[in-house]
């Protein structure tokens, strides 16, 4: 398994599993014609890259000319705009958990940083692995790096060890020799970024000094390299994690506004520094990390793209793991409801504010991660994501840690996903009209969302209606990963994909049973909120009381912690709280069949937070008022 330590939205990641497909873009303008001609010429045997990459056991510096493409090729890339570059970058993959595998402590104890890349379970990178990724349909590779793996920064020495620098350069050369676009960054790197949030000005100054020194060395080393090499200002650290405490020992003091200001400052310093180094860095494409690399936070007006002396050479980086419970946990196994599509389509449309301003956008990480093979509906998730990338000019870069692409054998883990990658490689789309690609993508997005809506409607036994009283279980797991129609408005479409509900129509007095089955989407962990709801209950059956007779959890009788009562918050929906932590006192208007509110509680089903729940069944009695 691949181990690392990095947070996502304040969630500590320990393992990354993944696999997915990506989509290509098409170059327009005269630059496209030039590049196409160069590519055709390259088929005649010209590798397009001068120099030979270092062997895996080499620690000496690679040739200064390694990775440089032909002059015509470079001129074509140099002439591209940001959006044209994104289309040329096509479909990408991360070399995950490899050169960012953190072992700074080992370096301080005298270990050779050249060997750290296997520390998180990945094999030592070879040219064959990288070429295999290219052959699998990936045109871009992102190489995360932990540069302090070769640095004594605690002593104020920010010199990057030559052995680490040389190893990174060797892997970059592998990728350039495979005719791939290459992204290099500083990736988590032990959390040193938290120095920017220190209450001590001296520590903050050291952080900026180290950042500048790091990128000066990287920039100088690669200043003559191909324009296919892209520098990325950070990973996910420019945002809330500027207050991380791994290195400083205490949480930072920056408030939200100050975090935005500091992130903007770092990005600005990054651009100015790289441009000042000259060579190809004067107009190299630079990838600017968004705030937390989160779409919503990056679209906040407080985030600013930096100014640049080069024309249309800035790209924006964000990551996409939404919904987190499906993408990164085992609690949710399905994706594809109308609300899932609405959420994904809405966020990608929101992000288009940057492409509309002329900035190419890189989805620097995305994946559906699982411990056991490929999750159900992964193909739906990826296909729709890639269609959005085509529609809005984004370059998607799969997060992969030897999960989809098996580096040791140069094979892929799933034929269906592999075919999606291959079918969308740049080679298959480079001759198509850009607007035609966008139009086709939009049609697929709309058709897919419509089909999902129709399929869901067909599966609902009792759709909402003002003429019926429908009983159902409102439910949200403790981690909110699994839910079903929470709130006083009965909405059977508002649920985690895969939840099966056994709802009933109330027709008068009698005993009824409602249920929820989570087994097809995972297991719920405890409950943050749950209640029995009866839509239109107060209108169609005014004054009725509903008494919980029995609760079954996974088929076993659950001993209730109190007595149930009937109430309503809106005068329309009747509710019987099962677990409502926001209600500590029984409301005076509450009612029971026997008229006695003694021992009544809004928390009669108090499940442990981590208890796994597969099924819930509630049997209750409806009684008319006397």
Report each predicted region and the residues it spans.
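Catalytic domains of carbohydrate-active enzymes, especially glycoside hydrolases
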Residues: 124-146, 347-354, 388, 395
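Aromatic-rich peripheral "rim/lid" segments of glycoside hydrolase catalytic domains that contact
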Residues: 373-465
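Extracellular beta-strand ligand-recognition surfaces/modules
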Residues: 514-543, 592-603, 613
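Bacterial lipoprotein signal-peptidase II cleavage site
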Residues: 43-54
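Active-site region of glycoside hydrolase catalytic domains
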Residues: 205-332, 348-369, 391-394
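N-terminal carbohydrate-binding accessory modules
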Residues: 58-140
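An active-site-proximal structural segment forming one wall of the substrate-binding cleft
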Residues: 120-141, 151, 156-188, 192-233, ...
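C-terminal motif of bacterial Sec signal peptides marking the signal peptidase cleavage site
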Residues: 38-42
């Amino acid at each position: 398994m691949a181990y690392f330590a990095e947070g996502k939205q304040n969630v500590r990641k320990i393992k990354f599993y993944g696999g997915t497909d990506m989509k290509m873009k098409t170059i327009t303008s005269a630059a496209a014609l030039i590049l196409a001609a160069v590519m055709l010429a390259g088929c005649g045997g010209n590798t397009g890259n001068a120099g030979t990459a270092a062997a895996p056991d080499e620690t000496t510096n690679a040739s200064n000319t390694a990775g440089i493409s032909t002059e015509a090729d470079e001129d074509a890339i140099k002439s591209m705009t940001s959006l044209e570059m994104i289309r040329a970058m096509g479909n990408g993959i991360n070399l995950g958990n490899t050169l960012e595998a953190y072992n700074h402590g080992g370096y301080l104890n005298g270990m050779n940083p050249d060997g750290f890349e296997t520390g998180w379970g990945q094999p030592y990178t070879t040219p064959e692995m990288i070429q295999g990724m290219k052959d699998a349909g990936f045109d871009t590779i992102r190489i995360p790096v932990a540069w302090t793996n070769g640095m004594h920064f605690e002593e104020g020495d920010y010199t990057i060890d030559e052995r680490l620098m040389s190893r990174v350069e060797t892997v970059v050369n592998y990728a350039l020799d495979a005719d791939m676009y290459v992204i290099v960054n500083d990736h988590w790197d032990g959390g040193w970024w938290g120095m920017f949030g220190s209450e001590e000005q001296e520590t903050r100054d050291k952080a900026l000094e180290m950042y500048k020194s790091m990128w000066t060395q990287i920039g100088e080393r690669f200043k003559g390299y191909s324009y296919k090499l892209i520098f990325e200002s950070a990973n996910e650290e420019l945002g809330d994690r500027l207050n991380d405490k791994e290195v400083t020992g205490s949480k930072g003091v920056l408030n939200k506004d100050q975090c935005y200001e500091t992130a903007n400052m770092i990005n600005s310093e990054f651009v100015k520094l790289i441009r000042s180094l000259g060579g190809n860095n004067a107009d190299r494409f630079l990838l600017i990390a968004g705030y937390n690399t989160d779409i919503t936070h990056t679209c906040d007006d407080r985030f600013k793209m930096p100014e640049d002396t080069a024309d249309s050479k800035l790209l924006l980086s964000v990551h996409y793991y939404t919904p987190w419970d499906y993408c990164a946990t085992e609690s949710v196994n399905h994706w594809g409801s109308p609300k899932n599509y609405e959420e994904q389509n809405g966020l990608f449309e929101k992000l288009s504010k940057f492409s509309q301003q002329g900035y190419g956008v890189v989805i620097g990480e995305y994946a559906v991660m699982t411990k056991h093979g490929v999750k159900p509906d992964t193909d739906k998730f990826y296909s729709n994501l890639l269609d959005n990338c085509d529609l809005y000019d984004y370059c998607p870069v799969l997060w992969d840690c030897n999960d989809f692409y098996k580096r040791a054998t140069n094979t892929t883990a799933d034929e269906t996903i592999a075919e999606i990658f291959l079918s969308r490689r740049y080679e298959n789309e480079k001759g198509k009209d850009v607007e035609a690609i966008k139009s086709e993508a939009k049609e697929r997005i709309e058709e897919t969302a419509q089909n999902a809506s129709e399929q869901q409607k067909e599966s609902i036994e009792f759709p909402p209606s003002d003429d019926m009283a429908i009983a159902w279980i409102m439910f949200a797991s403790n981690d909110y990963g699994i839910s079903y129609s929470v709130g006083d408005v009965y909405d059977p479409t508002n649920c985690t994909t895969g939840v099966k509900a056994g709802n009933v129509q109330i027709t008068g007095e009698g005993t009824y049973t409602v249920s929820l089955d989570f087994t097809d989407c995972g297991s719920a962990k405890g409950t943050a909120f749950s209640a029995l709801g009866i839509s239109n209950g107060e209108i169609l059956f005014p004054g009725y009381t509903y008494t919980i007779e029995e609760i079954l959890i996974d088929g076993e009788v659950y001993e209730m912690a109190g007595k149930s009562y009937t109430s309503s918050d809106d005068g329309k929906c009747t509710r019987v709280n099962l677990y409502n932590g926001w209600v500590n006192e029984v409301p005076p208007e509450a009612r029971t069949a026997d008229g006695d509110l003694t021992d009544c509680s809004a928390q009669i089903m108090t499940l442990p937070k981590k208890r796994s729940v597969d099924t819930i069944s509630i049997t209750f009695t409806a009684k008319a008022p006397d």
